[in-house]
Curated annotation (Swiss-Prot):
Biological process according to GO: translation
Primary residence: plastid
Lineage: Eukaryota, Viridiplantae, Chlorophyta, core chlorophytes, Chlorophyceae
Gene: rps2-2
Name of the protein described by the UniProt record: Putative ribosomal protein uS2-like
Keyword Plastid carried by entry: yes
Length: 208
């Protein structure tokens, strides 16, 4: 009986050790995978860097654009200038209040940051833009704003959408992730192609 108890105790101890080792190995693998993904993202970003000069971005804002791209695609935990501003303004507040306010500010920046500089854009420049609307019913405010500003709209139209509100529409399931990814991929390919043609046309016109 004592032999049985001793064997059982040893077996339990060995199993616990194996479990701990496996957990440690899993954590190491998880960290390595994260690092490999980060390295792959950094490589993609380095390849993309030379293309920054072709973006319709002023030279003074290229650094800001690069930081944003690094934060979005390479290292989401990287401190962004806006985050440092938040931290500076909230340094005297309690942790709870600071976290709550920072969350609210980040939410406002997320949803309104894109239109914060639109007041500086001329009316003709705004009208030259195009909006791609996915989920028409949820984005009716955006649709109305585009109509007011004269921005042309491409709608991904599902069975519960009104195609009459769109300048151009694509019948598709706006809830299916793969469907949206495929359509946006096609859009991106054509936009890049058009941008390359535009750059080449500008270069040839300057040579003449």
């Amino acid at each position: 009986m004592n032999v049985y108890v001793t064997l059982k105790t040893k077996l339990v101890a060995e199993l616990r050790q194996i479990k701990q080792t496996l957990q440690t190995e899993r954590n190491i693998i998880r960290v390595l995978r994260r690092k490999l993904k980060q390295i792959a993202a950094q490589k993609r970003f380095i390849k993309f860097l030379p293309k920054l000069r072709y973006l319709p971005t002023p030279v003074t804002k290229i650094e800001q654009t690069a930081r944003f791209l690094v934060k979005k695609f390479v290292d989401p935990k990287m401190k962004y200038p806006m985050d440092s501003i938040y931290d500076k303004k909230l340094s005297r507040q309690s942790k709870k209040v600071a976290a709550s306010r920072k969350k609210k500010w980040q939410r406002l920046e997320k949803y309104l940051g894109g239109i914060s500089n639109m007041t500086k854009i001329k009316e003709k420049q705004i009208a030259n833009n195009v909006a791609i609307i996915i989920g028409q019913q949820e984005e009716m405010n955006a649709v109305r704003e585009c109509q007011k500003l004269g921005i042309k709209m491409f709608h991904i139209v599902d069975t519960n959408c009104n195609p009459g509100l769109a300048d151009h529409f694509i019948p598709a399931n706006d809830d299916a992730r793969n469907s949206i990814k495929f359509i946006l991929g096609k859009f991106l390919t054509r936009i890049r192609l058009a941008h390359k043609i535009k750059v080449k046309f500008k270069k040839t016109s300057l040579k003449k």
